[in-house]
Structures are given as structure tokens and as C-alpha cells.
């Protein structure tokens, strides 16, 4: 409950600045491992943008993991960070099928919107990586789905694809669940 309190989030940016100011050596700052930095509320709060401004100010690099084309709002900052240190945007992709995407990933950018964002980031010189996960048995594990995503990754010229769970076994209980 305390974690979700607005006051906790209001202190996030000053705490980040204090931590960055004290670091002796710049490094890559990661965003998005626990929650997407571009949730819809970000449009109002702008915490991600403020964090990126601090990362730029103190000369750090950045890596972001997102499912949102909203990342393009901060393209100007991402380019500057990439020029002075390094910036990598990682985009999670689950399915090539737009209708399935809307069912299993409601409230996030569609696969098509994410691929368009990847191309814009590429054209801006920002390295991109795709997380191809999760692969769900009988949902998105078809050859057509995997090939569709891989073809789009090739077109977007992503620098890498991270994939895990392709060897999923259906132990007792899993088969019934899926």
C-alpha cells in the first residue's frame, strides 16, 4: 500500500537525482524491468521523461523495456542520450496477430504500432531489441506467428531478439490450463 501511495511516486525523481549525482562512474540505467515506463498515466505524470532528463544531465546511458509506442514522445531525449553515452530501447512482442494482441495484451500498443515505433527508433539511430515472449502453448506458438514476428524484426533491423520459454513443456496441470 505504501509503495502505491502517490507520495512515494512523487519522491522518485528527487531520489533518482540524488543517486545519479553520487555515482562516481556513469553506467546504463535500466527502466521497465518491473513495470512499463510508458503506462497511460505517464502522459500525465511525465516521470519517465523527467528520469530521462536526469540520465542525460548526469551523462548516463539508458535502456528501456516497453510495450508502448509512447516511447516516441521522448525520442529527442533518447537521441541525445544515445549520442553522449548509449541508449537502447527494448520492445516486448507477443503475437503477430493484431486481434489476438488486443485480447491477450489489452491496454498496450498493438504489435503494428510497436513495429512502427521500432522503425522510427532505428531511423533515429537508437539501437532496438525485441523480447519475443511469452510464447504460450496453443495461443501464440504457431509457426505463422513466430515467422511473422521474425520477419518484422528483420524489416525493422533490430539489433537482437531475446526469447525464452520456447522449450515449454506441458507438465500435469499446465496442459489443462492452456
Predicted regions and their residues:
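Short capping/connector residues at structural and topological boundaries
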Residues: 8, 43, 109, 140-141
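Conserved C-terminal portion of the radical SAM core fold
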Residues: 112-173
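A short secondary-structure junction signal
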Residues: 43, 101-104, 141-144, 148
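Residue-level signature of transmembrane alpha-helix interfaces in integral membrane proteins
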Residues: 75, 79, 108, 149-150, ...
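Surface-exposed cleft-lining segments at the edges of enzyme active sites
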Residues: 99-107, 133-138
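Acidic, Ser/Thr-rich peripheral helices and adjacent loops at domain boundaries
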Residues: 177-178
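Conserved Radical SAM active-site core
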Residues: 1-90, 94-102, 115
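Repeat-unit-sized solenoid/scaffold elements
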Residues: 54-65, 69, 104-105, 156-174
Amino acid at each position: 500500500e505504501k509503495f502505491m501511495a502517490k507520495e512515494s511516486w512523487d519522491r522518485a525523481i528527487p531520489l533518482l537525482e540524488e543517486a545519479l549525482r553520487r555515482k562516481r562512474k556513469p553506467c546504463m540505467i535500466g527502466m521497465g524491468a518491473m513495470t512499463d515506463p510508458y503506462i497511460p498515466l505517464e502522459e500525465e505524470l511525465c516521470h519517465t521523461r523527467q528520469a530521462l532528463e536526469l540520465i542525460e544531465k548526469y551523462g548516463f546511458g539508458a535502456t528501456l523495456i516497453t510495450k508502448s509506442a509512447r516511447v516516441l514522445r521522448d525520442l529527442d531525449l533518447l537521441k541525445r542520450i544515445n549520442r553522449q553515452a548509449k541508449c537502447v530501447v527494448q520492445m516486448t512482442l507477443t503475437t503477430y496477430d493484431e486481434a489476438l494482441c488486443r485480447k491477450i495484451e489489452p491496454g498496450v500498443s498493438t504489435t503494428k504500432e510497436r513495429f512502427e515505433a521500432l522503425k522510427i527508433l532505428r531511423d533515429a539511430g537508437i539501437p532496438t531489441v525485441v523480447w519475443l515472449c511469452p510464447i504460450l502453448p496453443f495461443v501464440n506458438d504457431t509457426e505463422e506467428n513466430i515467422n511473422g514476428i521474425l520477419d518484422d524484426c528483420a524489416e525493422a533491423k533490430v539489433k537482437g531478439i531475446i526469447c525464452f520459454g520456447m522449450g515449454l513443456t506441458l507438465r500435469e496441470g499446465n496442459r489443462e490450463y492452456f
